[in-house]
């Protein structure tokens, strides 16, 4: 069971302290920091990680990844975690079965509570969420997508970055989503507050470690992002998961990057275990657990 509360009239880029109380319990004291206005433009740090659905051979791997993130920021930055880490992106497969309450409680929330008690996260649906009611109950995402598909695709701005969440699952590979994205990107071209576009979706277009996961719909998304980047001269990235490993590449003729953000808990897709391919747009692929840190500089 997750409760939510809406707090209004908060100032931007401000630290707030909070506790959670029930009739019988009171939590420890936590903090969060509100986002800056896009027009104020500040440097931000973003973590991206995906596919933390539990591997029975390493059931606490997601907790290890979360602790590694916290340790990294403690060692390399001063102050509280949320003073140096602004948000976390998750391109799908948060749990093994989105319809299983215990998976949400035991495999996801309990293993990430130290991180997500102070830093917001923004996921998109993977195939393992199964379009479940529990996902939509637990998440509170921007509701600015196509009418009838709210929280399936959405966008939000943080500093000079526009973050776009998409749904690449079978039944949502539809023209409504592509048209919405095309319109949004067109409106972003001349937005002086936005310098970068980061999109996230679950399925790859090309996967070097696991080619059965390749999805032509993602290729259409990439084409729209490449066209946007060419027209606007604003770099774009798409983050994805589905393949349990890390890959990084760049479109040949465009300032568009593609990053498989590595599995944060699911079983690794090892070299030699699956159909695989060496695609020219990729510079590196590794069969490892991990996460990605993106540092965005103001200006």
Identify the role of each PLM range.
Residues 1, 48-71, 98, 137-146, ...:
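Acidic/histidine-rich helix-loop elements
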Residues 1-59, 71, 75, 79-82, ...:
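Acidic, histidine-bearing metal-coordination/catalytic regions of metal-dependent phosphoesterases
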Residues 15-31, 102-193, 212, 216-237, ...:
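Extended active-site neighborhood of metal-dependent phosphoesterases/phosphodiesterases
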Residues 42-56, 160-170, 198-202, 256-263:
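Active-site-proximal beta-strand elements of phosphoester/diester hydrolases
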Residues 42-124, 129:
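Conserved, compact domain cores that house catalytic/ligand-binding motifs in diverse enzymes
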Residues 52, 199-205, 238-248:
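Histidine-centered catalytic micro-motifs
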Residues 86, 195-197, 236:
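Conserved acidic residues
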Residues 90-95, 188-210:
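Short acidic, glycine-rich surface-loop motifs adjacent to enzyme active sites
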């Amino acid at each position: 069971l997750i409760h939510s509360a809406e707090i209004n009239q908060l100032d931007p880029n401000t630290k707030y302290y909070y506790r959670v109380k029930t009739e019988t319990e009171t939590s420890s004291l936590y903090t969060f920091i509100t986002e800056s206005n896009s027009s104020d433009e500040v440097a931000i740090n973003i973590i991206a990680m995906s596919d933390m659905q539990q591997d029975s051979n390493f059931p606490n791997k997601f907790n290890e990844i979360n602790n590694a993130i916290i340790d990294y920021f403690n060692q390399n930055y001063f102050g509280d975690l949320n003073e140096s880490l602004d948000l976390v992106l998750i391109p799908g497969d948060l749990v093994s079965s989105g319809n299983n309450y215990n998976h949400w409680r035991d495999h996801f929330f309990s293993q990430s509570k130290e991180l997500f008690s102070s830093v917001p996260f923004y996921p998109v649906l993977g195939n393992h969420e199964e379009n479940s009611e529990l996902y939509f109950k637990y998440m509170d995402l921007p509701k600015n997508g196509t009418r009838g598909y709210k929280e399936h695709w959405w966008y939000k701005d943080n500093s000079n970055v526009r973050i776009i969440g998409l749904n690449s699952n079978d039944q949502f590979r539809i023209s409504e989503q592509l048209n919405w994205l095309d319109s949004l990107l067109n409106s972003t071209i001349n937005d002086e507050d936005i310098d970068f576009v980061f999109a996230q979706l679950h399925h790859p277009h090309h996967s070097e470690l696991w080619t059965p996961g390749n999805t032509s719909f993602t290729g259409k998304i990439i084409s729209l992002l490449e066209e946007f980047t060419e027209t606007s001269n604003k770099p774009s990235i798409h983050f994805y998961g589905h393949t349990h490993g890390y890959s990084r590449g760049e479109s040949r003729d465009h300032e568009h990057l593609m990053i498989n953000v590595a599995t944060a808990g699911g079983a690794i897709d090892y070299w030699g275990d699956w159909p695989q391919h060496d695609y020219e747009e990729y510079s590196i692929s590794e069969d490892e657990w991990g996460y990605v840190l993106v540092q965005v500089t103001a200006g």
